[in-house]
A protein has these predicted regions:
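FIC/Doc superfamily catalytic core
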Residues: 1-407
Length: 407
Protein backbone atom coordinates (compact mmCIF):
# COMPACT_ATOMS: atom_id res chain seq x y z
CA UNK A 1 0.00 0.00 0.00
CA UNK A 2 1.22 3.50 -0.84
CA UNK A 3 2.31 5.62 2.10
CA UNK A 4 0.67 9.05 2.31
CA UNK A 5 3.30 11.78 2.34
CA UNK A 6 1.57 14.75 0.68
CA UNK A 7 -1.45 16.64 2.10
CA UNK A 8 -3.23 16.46 -1.27
CA UNK A 9 -3.89 12.79 -0.48
CA UNK A 10 -6.57 13.77 2.06
CA UNK A 11 -8.63 15.77 -0.47
CA UNK A 12 -11.48 16.57 -0.58
CA UNK A 13 -11.55 18.46 2.70
CA UNK A 14 -15.20 19.45 2.26
CA UNK A 15 -17.81 17.34 0.45
CA UNK A 16 -19.78 18.54 -2.56
CA UNK A 17 -22.30 15.69 -2.43
CA UNK A 18 -25.54 15.94 -0.41
CA UNK A 19 -25.38 19.73 -0.24
CA UNK A 20 -29.15 20.11 0.15
CA UNK A 21 -29.35 17.60 3.01
CA UNK A 22 -26.40 19.18 4.83
CA UNK A 23 -27.94 22.65 4.45
CA UNK A 24 -31.26 21.36 5.80
CA UNK A 25 -29.54 19.77 8.80
CA UNK A 26 -27.57 22.95 9.46
CA UNK A 27 -30.77 25.01 9.59
CA UNK A 28 -32.46 22.46 11.86
CA UNK A 29 -29.47 22.40 14.23
CA UNK A 30 -29.28 26.19 14.49
CA UNK A 31 -33.00 26.36 15.25
CA UNK A 32 -32.89 23.50 17.79
CA UNK A 33 -29.82 24.98 19.50
CA UNK A 34 -31.63 28.28 20.01
CA UNK A 35 -34.62 26.47 21.52
CA UNK A 36 -32.38 24.50 23.88
CA UNK A 37 -30.65 27.55 25.34
CA UNK A 38 -34.08 29.07 26.03
CA UNK A 39 -35.14 26.09 28.15
CA UNK A 40 -33.15 27.09 31.24
CA UNK A 41 -33.83 30.55 32.66
CA UNK A 42 -31.71 30.46 35.81
CA UNK A 43 -27.96 30.98 35.21
CA UNK A 44 -27.22 28.84 38.26
CA UNK A 45 -29.38 25.93 37.07
CA UNK A 46 -27.74 26.25 33.66
CA UNK A 47 -24.32 25.94 35.31
CA UNK A 48 -25.42 22.94 37.38
CA UNK A 49 -26.83 21.16 34.33
CA UNK A 50 -23.66 21.97 32.37
CA UNK A 51 -21.64 20.34 35.18
CA UNK A 52 -23.76 17.18 34.82
CA UNK A 53 -23.30 17.27 31.03
CA UNK A 54 -19.52 17.57 31.48
CA UNK A 55 -19.59 14.41 33.61
CA UNK A 56 -21.79 12.79 30.98
CA UNK A 57 -19.31 13.80 28.28
CA UNK A 58 -16.43 12.01 30.01
CA UNK A 59 -18.69 9.00 30.74
CA UNK A 60 -19.48 8.56 27.04
CA UNK A 61 -15.99 9.43 25.82
CA UNK A 62 -14.69 6.67 28.12
CA UNK A 63 -17.32 4.26 26.76
CA UNK A 64 -16.28 4.97 23.17
CA UNK A 65 -12.72 4.07 24.19
CA UNK A 66 -13.86 0.84 25.87
CA UNK A 67 -13.91 2.02 29.51
CA UNK A 68 -17.02 2.11 31.70
CA UNK A 69 -17.30 4.37 34.73
CA UNK A 70 -20.58 4.88 36.58
CA UNK A 71 -21.86 8.40 37.32
CA UNK A 72 -21.41 7.72 41.05
CA UNK A 73 -17.80 6.63 40.48
CA UNK A 74 -17.21 9.89 38.61
CA UNK A 75 -18.78 11.86 41.46
CA UNK A 76 -16.57 10.04 43.98
CA UNK A 77 -13.48 10.72 41.87
CA UNK A 78 -14.29 14.44 41.86
CA UNK A 79 -14.17 14.21 45.66
CA UNK A 80 -10.84 12.31 45.44
CA UNK A 81 -12.55 9.12 46.65
CA UNK A 82 -10.96 6.44 44.48
CA UNK A 83 -11.89 2.77 44.20
CA UNK A 84 -9.56 0.09 45.54
CA UNK A 85 -10.24 -1.89 42.38
CA UNK A 86 -7.42 -1.08 39.93
CA UNK A 87 -9.57 -1.05 36.79
CA UNK A 88 -12.26 1.13 38.37
CA UNK A 89 -9.61 3.47 39.77
CA UNK A 90 -7.97 3.81 36.34
CA UNK A 91 -11.35 4.63 34.81
CA UNK A 92 -11.93 7.24 37.52
CA UNK A 93 -8.54 8.80 36.68
CA UNK A 94 -9.47 8.91 32.99
CA UNK A 95 -12.75 10.62 33.91
CA UNK A 96 -11.05 13.19 36.11
CA UNK A 97 -8.51 14.00 33.41
CA UNK A 98 -11.23 14.46 30.80
CA UNK A 99 -13.30 16.78 33.01
CA UNK A 100 -10.24 18.84 33.99
CA UNK A 101 -9.09 19.27 30.39
CA UNK A 102 -12.58 20.19 29.21
CA UNK A 103 -12.77 22.92 31.86
CA UNK A 104 -9.30 24.18 30.93
CA UNK A 105 -10.29 24.16 27.27
CA UNK A 106 -13.41 26.21 27.94
CA UNK A 107 -11.33 28.76 29.85
CA UNK A 108 -8.74 28.94 27.09
CA UNK A 109 -11.39 29.50 24.44
CA UNK A 110 -12.30 32.79 26.13
CA UNK A 111 -9.22 34.08 24.27
CA UNK A 112 -10.46 34.72 20.73
CA UNK A 113 -6.92 34.49 19.36
CA UNK A 114 -6.67 30.76 20.16
CA UNK A 115 -6.72 28.80 16.89
CA UNK A 116 -8.64 25.61 17.56
CA UNK A 117 -7.33 24.05 14.33
CA UNK A 118 -3.66 24.72 15.14
CA UNK A 119 -1.32 21.77 15.77
CA UNK A 120 -0.21 23.51 18.98
CA UNK A 121 -3.79 23.43 20.28
CA UNK A 122 -4.19 19.74 19.45
CA UNK A 123 -0.88 18.91 21.14
CA UNK A 124 -1.91 21.01 24.14
CA UNK A 125 -5.13 18.97 24.54
CA UNK A 126 -3.15 15.72 24.32
CA UNK A 127 -0.50 16.91 26.77
CA UNK A 128 -3.00 18.25 29.32
CA UNK A 129 -4.93 14.98 29.26
CA UNK A 130 -2.01 12.58 29.62
CA UNK A 131 -0.05 14.59 32.18
CA UNK A 132 -3.06 14.22 34.48
CA UNK A 133 -2.91 10.44 34.34
CA UNK A 134 -0.77 8.21 36.57
CA UNK A 135 2.31 6.67 34.94
CA UNK A 136 0.78 3.20 34.32
CA UNK A 137 -1.81 4.86 32.04
CA UNK A 138 0.98 6.32 29.89
CA UNK A 139 1.28 2.97 28.13
CA UNK A 140 -0.75 1.50 25.27
CA UNK A 141 -0.63 -1.75 23.32
CA UNK A 142 -1.02 -2.59 19.65
CA UNK A 143 -3.42 -5.29 18.49
CA UNK A 144 -0.39 -7.58 18.34
CA UNK A 145 0.20 -6.97 22.06
CA UNK A 146 3.27 -4.77 21.69
CA UNK A 147 3.42 -2.15 24.47
CA UNK A 148 4.63 1.38 23.84
CA UNK A 149 4.87 4.57 25.88
CA UNK A 150 2.56 7.47 25.10
CA UNK A 151 4.43 10.79 24.93
CA UNK A 152 2.10 13.57 26.17
CA UNK A 153 1.68 16.31 23.59
CA UNK A 154 4.03 14.70 21.06
CA UNK A 155 3.10 13.76 17.52
CA UNK A 156 3.28 10.14 16.45
CA UNK A 157 6.85 9.07 15.57
CA UNK A 158 6.12 5.65 14.06
CA UNK A 159 4.04 4.11 11.29
CA UNK A 160 0.67 2.67 12.24
CA UNK A 161 -2.36 0.87 10.81
CA UNK A 162 -5.84 1.63 12.18
CA UNK A 163 -8.32 -0.96 11.02
CA UNK A 164 -8.04 -1.00 7.21
CA UNK A 165 -6.51 2.48 7.10
CA UNK A 166 -2.82 3.36 7.05
CA UNK A 167 -2.46 6.98 8.26
CA UNK A 168 0.17 9.31 6.77
CA UNK A 169 3.89 8.83 7.23
CA UNK A 170 4.79 10.19 10.67
CA UNK A 171 7.54 12.34 9.12
CA UNK A 172 4.88 14.14 7.06
CA UNK A 173 2.49 14.86 9.96
CA UNK A 174 3.52 18.56 10.28
CA UNK A 175 2.64 19.11 6.60
CA UNK A 176 -0.75 17.40 6.96
CA UNK A 177 -1.60 19.31 10.14
CA UNK A 178 -0.54 22.60 8.57
CA UNK A 179 -2.91 21.95 5.65
CA UNK A 180 -5.63 20.95 8.13
CA UNK A 181 -5.18 24.25 9.97
CA UNK A 182 -4.98 26.56 6.97
CA UNK A 183 -7.99 25.04 5.19
CA UNK A 184 -10.46 24.51 8.01
CA UNK A 185 -9.40 27.64 9.89
CA UNK A 186 -9.84 29.87 6.83
CA UNK A 187 -11.77 32.98 7.87
CA UNK A 188 -13.41 33.11 4.44
CA UNK A 189 -15.45 29.95 5.02
CA UNK A 190 -19.09 30.99 5.29
CA UNK A 191 -20.68 30.65 8.71
CA UNK A 192 -23.48 28.65 7.08
CA UNK A 193 -20.88 26.00 6.24
CA UNK A 194 -19.26 25.88 9.68
CA UNK A 195 -21.15 22.81 10.88
CA UNK A 196 -20.13 20.84 7.81
CA UNK A 197 -16.55 22.05 8.38
CA UNK A 198 -16.64 20.75 11.97
CA UNK A 199 -17.93 17.38 10.77
CA UNK A 200 -15.42 17.05 7.93
CA UNK A 201 -12.54 18.17 10.17
CA UNK A 202 -13.53 15.51 12.71
CA UNK A 203 -13.02 12.80 10.12
CA UNK A 204 -9.92 14.20 8.49
CA UNK A 205 -8.17 14.60 11.85
CA UNK A 206 -8.99 10.97 12.64
CA UNK A 207 -7.64 10.04 9.19
CA UNK A 208 -4.36 11.88 9.93
CA UNK A 209 -4.10 10.07 13.30
CA UNK A 210 -1.56 12.55 14.70
CA UNK A 211 -0.79 10.85 18.03
CA UNK A 212 0.43 7.44 19.07
CA UNK A 213 -2.67 7.02 21.24
CA UNK A 214 -5.50 9.19 22.54
CA UNK A 215 -6.56 10.44 19.10
CA UNK A 216 -10.26 9.81 19.67
CA UNK A 217 -10.33 11.81 22.89
CA UNK A 218 -8.42 14.72 21.37
CA UNK A 219 -10.59 14.75 18.24
CA UNK A 220 -13.84 14.80 20.23
CA UNK A 221 -12.51 17.54 22.51
CA UNK A 222 -11.47 19.55 19.46
CA UNK A 223 -14.95 19.14 17.94
CA UNK A 224 -16.40 20.34 21.25
CA UNK A 225 -14.03 23.33 21.17
CA UNK A 226 -15.26 24.22 17.68
CA UNK A 227 -18.89 24.05 18.78
CA UNK A 228 -18.08 26.36 21.69
CA UNK A 229 -16.12 28.75 19.47
CA UNK A 230 -19.04 29.08 17.05
CA UNK A 231 -21.70 29.38 19.78
CA UNK A 232 -23.27 25.99 19.06
CA UNK A 233 -22.54 24.15 22.31
CA UNK A 234 -25.77 25.37 23.92
CA UNK A 235 -23.89 26.80 26.93
CA UNK A 236 -22.74 23.27 27.74
CA UNK A 237 -26.26 21.80 27.79
CA UNK A 238 -25.57 18.96 25.34
CA UNK A 239 -22.71 16.73 24.24
CA UNK A 240 -21.82 15.06 20.97
CA UNK A 241 -20.19 12.10 22.72
CA UNK A 242 -23.52 10.71 23.95
CA UNK A 243 -24.73 10.30 20.38
CA UNK A 244 -21.44 8.89 19.13
CA UNK A 245 -21.39 6.34 21.97
CA UNK A 246 -25.04 5.46 21.44
CA UNK A 247 -24.35 4.74 17.77
CA UNK A 248 -20.77 3.59 18.23
CA UNK A 249 -20.91 0.96 15.48
CA UNK A 250 -22.37 3.45 12.98
CA UNK A 251 -19.80 6.03 14.07
CA UNK A 252 -16.84 3.73 13.46
CA UNK A 253 -18.37 2.41 10.23
CA UNK A 254 -18.88 5.96 8.92
CA UNK A 255 -15.31 6.89 9.87
CA UNK A 256 -13.93 3.80 8.14
CA UNK A 257 -16.02 4.29 4.99
CA UNK A 258 -14.85 7.90 4.69
CA UNK A 259 -11.25 6.61 4.68
CA UNK A 260 -11.92 5.03 1.28
CA UNK A 261 -10.48 6.24 -1.98
CA UNK A 262 -12.52 7.86 -4.75
CA UNK A 263 -15.04 5.45 -6.28
CA UNK A 264 -14.96 6.38 -9.97
CA UNK A 265 -15.23 9.57 -12.02
CA UNK A 266 -18.51 10.67 -10.41
CA UNK A 267 -17.11 10.64 -6.87
CA UNK A 268 -15.38 14.00 -6.73
CA UNK A 269 -11.88 14.88 -7.87
CA UNK A 270 -9.80 14.18 -4.77
CA UNK A 271 -7.88 11.12 -3.66
CA UNK A 272 -10.60 10.16 -1.15
CA UNK A 273 -14.31 9.57 -1.70
CA UNK A 274 -16.43 12.74 -1.77
CA UNK A 275 -19.63 10.73 -1.32
CA UNK A 276 -18.29 8.88 1.73
CA UNK A 277 -17.17 12.14 3.36
CA UNK A 278 -20.64 13.58 2.70
CA UNK A 279 -22.23 10.50 4.29
CA UNK A 280 -20.03 10.94 7.36
CA UNK A 281 -20.98 14.62 7.63
CA UNK A 282 -24.68 13.75 7.36
CA UNK A 283 -24.30 11.15 10.13
CA UNK A 284 -22.37 13.65 12.27
CA UNK A 285 -24.95 16.43 11.86
CA UNK A 286 -27.87 14.04 12.39
CA UNK A 287 -26.21 12.96 15.64
CA UNK A 288 -25.82 16.58 16.73
CA UNK A 289 -29.47 17.35 15.99
CA UNK A 290 -30.66 14.23 17.82
CA UNK A 291 -28.69 15.11 20.96
CA UNK A 292 -29.81 18.74 21.01
CA UNK A 293 -33.44 17.67 20.64
CA UNK A 294 -33.00 15.00 23.34
CA UNK A 295 -31.64 17.54 25.85
CA UNK A 296 -34.28 20.09 24.89
CA UNK A 297 -36.99 17.59 25.78
CA UNK A 298 -35.23 16.63 28.99
CA UNK A 299 -34.96 20.26 30.14
CA UNK A 300 -38.57 21.17 29.39
CA UNK A 301 -39.41 22.87 32.69
CA UNK A 302 -42.94 21.48 33.31
CA UNK A 303 -41.70 17.95 32.59
CA UNK A 304 -38.64 18.45 34.81
CA UNK A 305 -40.86 19.68 37.66
CA UNK A 306 -42.99 16.55 37.28
CA UNK A 307 -39.91 14.30 37.46
CA UNK A 308 -38.76 16.09 40.64
CA UNK A 309 -42.19 15.47 42.17
CA UNK A 310 -42.11 11.80 41.18
CA UNK A 311 -38.64 11.37 42.66
CA UNK A 312 -39.96 12.40 46.07
CA UNK A 313 -43.22 10.46 45.65
CA UNK A 314 -41.70 7.15 44.56
CA UNK A 315 -37.94 7.13 45.21
CA UNK A 316 -37.34 9.13 48.39
CA UNK A 317 -39.51 6.81 50.49
CA UNK A 318 -36.83 6.59 53.17
CA UNK A 319 -37.75 10.15 54.17
CA UNK A 320 -40.34 9.66 56.89
CA UNK A 321 -40.93 13.35 57.64
CA UNK A 322 -41.35 16.48 55.51
CA UNK A 323 -41.06 14.69 52.18
CA UNK A 324 -43.81 16.81 50.60
CA UNK A 325 -42.32 20.04 51.95
CA UNK A 326 -38.83 19.11 50.80
CA UNK A 327 -40.21 18.36 47.34
CA UNK A 328 -41.73 21.86 47.12
CA UNK A 329 -38.45 23.51 48.09
CA UNK A 330 -36.46 21.39 45.63
CA UNK A 331 -38.94 22.05 42.83
CA UNK A 332 -38.67 25.79 43.44
CA UNK A 333 -34.87 25.58 43.29
CA UNK A 334 -35.03 23.72 39.97
CA UNK A 335 -37.10 26.66 38.69
CA UNK A 336 -35.17 29.54 40.23
CA UNK A 337 -31.70 28.18 40.97
CA UNK A 338 -31.27 29.96 44.32
CA UNK A 339 -33.51 31.09 47.17
CA UNK A 340 -32.98 32.59 50.61
CA UNK A 341 -33.46 30.40 53.65
CA UNK A 342 -36.36 32.60 54.68
CA UNK A 343 -38.24 31.56 51.53
CA UNK A 344 -38.54 28.02 52.87
CA UNK A 345 -41.15 29.17 55.39
CA UNK A 346 -43.13 30.82 52.61
CA UNK A 347 -42.92 27.77 50.31
CA UNK A 348 -43.80 25.19 52.98
CA UNK A 349 -46.06 27.19 55.27
CA UNK A 350 -44.14 25.85 58.25
CA UNK A 351 -42.74 27.61 61.31
CA UNK A 352 -39.11 28.76 61.39
CA UNK A 353 -37.95 25.81 63.51
CA UNK A 354 -39.57 23.27 61.19
CA UNK A 355 -38.21 25.10 58.13
CA UNK A 356 -34.72 24.80 59.62
CA UNK A 357 -35.26 21.03 59.93
CA UNK A 358 -36.38 20.85 56.28
CA UNK A 359 -33.28 22.78 55.19
CA UNK A 360 -31.01 20.44 57.13
CA UNK A 361 -32.79 17.43 55.66
CA UNK A 362 -32.37 18.73 52.10
CA UNK A 363 -28.69 19.50 52.62
CA UNK A 364 -28.09 16.07 54.15
CA UNK A 365 -29.86 14.43 51.20
CA UNK A 366 -27.84 16.51 48.73
CA UNK A 367 -30.93 17.66 46.80
CA UNK A 368 -29.77 21.23 47.30
CA UNK A 369 -26.63 22.89 48.64
CA UNK A 370 -25.39 26.09 50.24
CA UNK A 371 -22.12 28.03 49.99
CA UNK A 372 -22.03 28.72 53.75
CA UNK A 373 -23.80 27.76 57.01
CA UNK A 374 -26.19 30.70 56.71
CA UNK A 375 -25.98 31.22 52.96
CA UNK A 376 -28.71 30.87 50.34
CA UNK A 377 -29.94 27.50 49.12
CA UNK A 378 -28.93 26.44 45.61
CA UNK A 379 -30.06 23.76 43.18
CA UNK A 380 -27.97 20.58 43.14
CA UNK A 381 -27.99 17.51 40.92
CA UNK A 382 -26.03 14.72 42.67
CA UNK A 383 -25.38 11.46 40.84
CA UNK A 384 -28.04 9.57 42.82
CA UNK A 385 -30.85 11.61 41.23
CA UNK A 386 -29.57 11.72 37.63
CA UNK A 387 -31.65 8.78 36.43
CA UNK A 388 -34.81 10.27 37.98
CA UNK A 389 -34.45 13.95 37.05
CA UNK A 390 -32.74 13.21 33.71
CA UNK A 391 -33.84 9.74 32.53
CA UNK A 392 -31.66 8.07 29.88
CA UNK A 393 -28.98 10.74 30.23
CA UNK A 394 -26.44 8.07 31.22
CA UNK A 395 -27.33 5.08 29.05
CA UNK A 396 -26.17 1.69 30.32
CA UNK A 397 -24.42 0.75 27.08
CA UNK A 398 -22.22 -2.34 26.66
CA UNK A 399 -18.46 -1.91 26.79
CA UNK A 400 -16.81 -2.68 23.47
CA UNK A 401 -13.05 -2.80 22.92
CA UNK A 402 -11.58 0.15 21.01
CA UNK A 403 -9.95 -0.29 17.63
CA UNK A 404 -6.26 -0.87 18.33
CA UNK A 405 -3.48 0.16 16.03
CA UNK A 406 -0.80 -2.10 14.64
CA UNK A 407 2.79 -0.99 14.35
Amino acid sequence: MDVYRHPSSMEPLLPKAQGARLSELTCDILKASGCLTGRVHSPLVLKRVADVVREMNCYYSNLIEGHKTTPRDIERALKRDFSKNETQRDNQQLSLAHIAVEKLMEERLADASVDVYAPDFLCWLHREFYTRLPEPLHWAATKRGKRYRIKPGCLRDFMVDVGQHTPPDFAALPKFLNRFQTFYGDKHILETNRLVVIAAAHHRLAWIHPFGDGNGRVIRLQSQALLIRHGLAGHGLWTLSRGLARWRQRYYAALETADCGRQGDLDGRGNLSDAALADFCVFFLETMLDQIQFMSGLLDLPALRTRVERYFQFQALHLKRYREELMRVTRTLVDEGEISRARVQEITGKAATVSAEIIKLGLDEGVFETPSPKGPLRAAFPAKIHEFYFPQLFLDLPVEPPIKSAT
